[in-house]
Amino acid sequence: MKREGVLYIISAPSGAGKTTLCKEIIDIFPHLRHSVSYTTRQPRAGEVHGKDYYFISMDEFRSMVDKGEFAEWAEVHGNCYGTSIRTLEECRITGIDLILDIDIQGARQLKERYEGGVYIFILPPSYEELRRRLNGRSSDSDDVISRRIDAAAGEIRESRWYDYIIVNDQFSRAVEELKSVVVAERCRTFRVLETVTERFDMG
């Protein structure tokens, strides 16, 4: 029997390198897929509709909320983000492992609604490095950067309830640590026991 897909929920303060890490780990594992979220924010340079996000209007987003189409959604820095229930159910049934690159509010909602998710928090090495990375983003204004820095302290405090914490100081090391989490979680007894029981007639 095919095992259910694993949900890897990854959160971080803006500038910690979460999105880059997620893209790297998806390139490494062919059966790992990125969950494409819906958002009301404007696309950044190089972002593609349907690949990075589904970019929709606020009216469209509210309509999806009213219809109960989101497994989780939240407003972050003035923009709305959401994960569709259909995406999660399709991957669970087909055995596809899914990376969810979402904020803390959304992660909390998922933890309350779904069992078996793996919660991973990505940290920058320091506040100083976080500010340096955010200042390097040409797409963000000084006001946006200041708001993100102010929010980071509260976000980092929330890391205590995640299953894993990875400090993204040296990128290659952070990738290896994230790889280790993915491999270990796939081997958890409760995920593979049904298959093993059938294969070795343990019933």
From Swiss-Prot:
GO CC aspect terms: cytosol
Single GO MF annotation: ATP binding
Compartment(s) of residence: Cytoplasm
Domain Guanylate kinase-like, first and last residues per copy: 5-183
Pfam families: Guanylate_kin
Enzyme Commission number(s) from the entry: 2.7.4.8
Superkingdom of the organism of origin: Bacteria
Positions bound to ATP: 12-19
CDD domains the UniProt entry points to: GMPK
Function of the protein: Essential for recycling GMP and indirectly, cGMP.
Family: Belongs to the guanylate kinase family.
HAMAP family given in the database record: Guanylate_kinase
Protein name: Guanylate kinase
Species the sequence originates in: Geobacter metallireducens (strain ATCC 53774 / DSM 7210 / GS-15)
Gene transcribed to yield this protein: gmk
